[in-house]
Curated annotation (Swiss-Prot):
Detected in enterocytes at the intestinal brush border membrane. Detected at the tip of intestinal microvilli (at protein level). It comes from Mus musculus (Mouse). InterPro entries: IQ_motif_EF-hand-BS, Kinesin_motor_dom_sf, Myosin_head_motor_dom-like, Myosin_TH1, MYSc_Myo1, P-loop_NTPase. Interacts (via the two IQ motifs) with calmodulin. Binds an additional calmodulin chain via a third, C-terminal region. Interacts with F-actin. The gene is Myo1d. Residues 812-1005 form the TH1 domain. This is Unconventional myosin-Id. Unconventional myosin that functions as actin-based motor protein with ATPase activity. Plays a role in endosomal protein trafficking, and especially in the transfer of cargo proteins from early to recycling endosomes. Required for normal planar cell polarity in ciliated tracheal cells, for normal rotational polarity of cilia, and for coordinated, unidirectional ciliary movement in the trachea. Required for normal, polarized cilia organization in brain ependymal epithelial cells. The modification N-acetylalanine is found at residue 2. Residues 572-594 are annotated as: Actin-binding. ATP binds at residues 102-109. Binds a calmodulin chain via each of the two IQ domains. IQ domain 1 mediates interaction with calmodulin both in the presence and in the absence of Ca(2+). IQ domain 2 mediates interaction with calmodulin in the presence of Ca(2+). The TH1 domain is required for activity in complementing zebrafish defects in Kupffer's vesicle lumen size. Its main location: cytoplasm.
Amino acid sequence: MAEQESLEFGKADFVLMDTVSMPEFMANLRLRFEKGRIYTFIGEVVVSVNPYKVLNIYGRDTVEQYKGRELYERPPHLFAIADAAYKAMKRRSKDTCIMISGESGAGKTEASKYIMQYIAAITNPSQRAEIERVKNMLLKSNCVLEAFGNAKTNRNDNSSRFGKYMDINFDFKGDPIGGHINNYLLEKSRVIVQQPGERSFHSFYQLLQGGSEQMLHSLHLQKSLSSYNYIRVGAQLKSSINDAAEFKVVADAMKVIGFKPEEIQTVYKILAVILHLGNLKFIVDGDTPLIENGKVVSVIAELLSTKADMVEKALLYRTVATGRDIIDKQHTEQEASYGRDAFAKAIYERLFCWIVTRINDIIEVKNYDTTIHGKNTVIGVLDIYGFEIFDNNSFEQFCINYCNEKLQQLFIQLVLKQEQEEYQREGIPWKHIDYFNNQIIVDLVEQQHKGIIAILDDACMNVGKVTDGMFLEALNSKLGKHGHFSSRKTCASDKILEFDRDFRIRHYAGDVVYSAIGFIDKNKDTLFQDFKRLMYNSSNPVLKNMWPEGKLSITEVTKRPLTAATLFKNSMIALVDNLASKEPYYVRCIKPNDKKSPQIFDDERCRHQVEYLGLLENVRVRRAGFAFRQTYEKFLHRYKMISEFTWPNHDLPSDKEAVKKLIERCGFQDDVAYGKSKIFIRTPRTLFTLEELRAQMLVRVVLFLQKVWRGTLARMRYKRTKAALTIIRYYRRYKVKSYIHEVARRFHGVKNMRDYGKHVKWPTPPKVLRRFEEALQSIFNRWRASQLIKTIPASDLPQVRAKVAAMEMLKGQRADLGLQRAWEGNYLASKPDTPQTSGTFVPVANELKRKDKYMNVLFSCHVRKVNRFSKVEDRAIFVTDRHLYKMDPTKQYKVMKTIPLYNLTGLSVSNGKDQLVVFHTKDNKDLIVCLFSKQPTHESRIGELVGVLVNHFKSEKRHLQVNVTNPVQCSLHGKKCTVSVETRLNQPQPDFTKNRSGFILSVPGN
């Protein structure tokens, strides 16, 4: 039941009326209309009264109020029924449909648009781009179909002149993924003629009023509506629709949907062709038919992308094949006009069907695999023409009203008849409620061999000239005694009916008088093959594809096509079967008055609609019946988690007993009845409470399942990880063993090799052993080095260590380190180097040893020295393990300067073959010298000096910084300067010269 509104608005649900009577029903309907409450429930059926004004009840805030809510939680609204259909589809994976019914002008088309907008608004919360694209196209398709399929009538400014059923496809998440549109019986006769006060289809007026001057010029059109015969009748009529604005809306919608520019242009050309066809005038010159305004033919040919003479021939002649002979039969003026009008109607119908097909191609569900994406469910929305009674009712009204009879029959079957029969079949106590079953009227129209459609088809198939009067006579003879059929012949006193013209059908919605004139022609729907060939031979591929049957040979014999009435009957039967397979939801639309006024509520007019829609009977069945029924098995499958007696499985004798236990556990036993195979629930509130309990339990069930499943996944992951680690461990062990074995094999016996295995190539280690390999190679290299060292005499070891130190510090930075010769170290005491003065130096060295108590002599050599005053002198350096002495060899090696080794911070040498060396001191009084030897001359001693000093410092666990650079940076008494080295030819010995930045050491060249 609906949420209770204030009493000033009446009853929100007709089921809540104190007494079920027509006066009370009408009083409540009037009160709610006058208070602006246009929607009222009958249980789960929405009764909608057309307000004839814009109401602010469809915005985003209203959508949020109804989203996910149950019917009884909010006041009556279209959104409530749309949400109910959506929830049923999503919860139970069941196809649903929303059937909107009512007579023309009752608001069906607007209702369908609001339902579509609501479904679009509540879906795709994650804003997936593809879903948004589909939703946008589904919504945009409405305005395109309205432009080409709707028209202004005396009862409705936007009347649907075709039937539309749209299936919206949803994925398992409940998001729209596509759709499909079925269209039924376009009223194409409106293209060429309209009743007074009515217009043709909106598309013509939109093109003329909204098209640009350039576009209209290219189509040979002008904005004046009265210039075109086919639409002149409605040219001066006022409409609530802004044609110019709607033209742009429709054009934009076609682009959004996916129509190509050339397709849109072809659509405009077809509309222009129809308007030009209406202006063609035929005259007869003797026996020859002619077109009075021949220029129009050229325009039509240009727009159809064909030749003017072909267009003219198709309009004036008809090609007839008799055996092998082909004859061009001239038309009379009347036949030419008939052919032109038939051509115009056919072109428009093909255009409309092509638009629907094109939209379907674009919005159809693509690449959807149910095994991957889950079940594809559907919500169908039926917006079809309402019941029509005009001053002049023809073939179109006959088909439309037959359609409404079929839909009313479906409503009776599902809501009134089947429901009561099901109660009796299930053994539920029930008092039968009488209702009018319109099956007799449906049979009157569609029954095989006896119905009106069968009689009409028989008349159309007769050989010779068959008139509408002959068809009416056949109706009189075969249906004259039928209770719902009458004519002037069967009711001679009824002067409303014209002789040989009218017949009356007593429909469920009231009596309708039909004029038989035009029935035969409209049922045959004749279009000469010449026009089909003309269109097929167009150079415009869009037009060509619209007329595939035009490719047939002139002499080819084709099967007689089904008549328009039979095609419509078959489509209605298929539609009803489709709707019957879905769970239905109803919107019953009521037209409050015929003046389109928002203030007038015509009691008599509304009462008549309430009666023929069977709304009062609907209330009675709803009050006495049950809102929901389900088989015990399915009910238990959905709600068994609510009770501990049924979860996860019950041990009771039957599913029925288990359902009883569950219902009693929840305390709903007074609101249900138990049938033979189904449970019946009276009020929606009980069902919604069950859904709430289920939703609460589902959280716990899902959490439990998640816990179990996550635990299972964790255990599986742990086992897989453990197994993988075991495999990795054993594999690594295997690789390590293999590597060790291979190393052992390759290096077996290296102790007996001359190079102790230097040439042996190491095997590639596993990634995990790369650091181990480095350590192993280091150990091997140490061992090999130790083996090599064992062969060196103990007296040579200091020299070897010094050479190693020199290599570490200078290798790759200086060309000649003097490694190939023996290092003497104390060259001043060597007779070959200083034959005259060596005897003088030795006593000085001994005295210094006594005085300074040094242990070892590290290095001594003659040098050339430069001081801060740029004075160059021959000197000698004497390096012990404690001091560096600068001596004057000309004064019997007198000590000129003593530098403690702890005051020495580093050495700088050049990267050439020269013997430049700078001793850096802590007090920034660097010593700049160039080593030189007398025998042999130019011997390189830099490597030896660096090696012995670095080795000595290392033995004392101190670091000596050695720089290799050119020029060399130094400091003389705190002043920064540089010493660069240059090679000069004809230079007898190294010499220093002054420059701007410091000094230049010139050394002899080759």
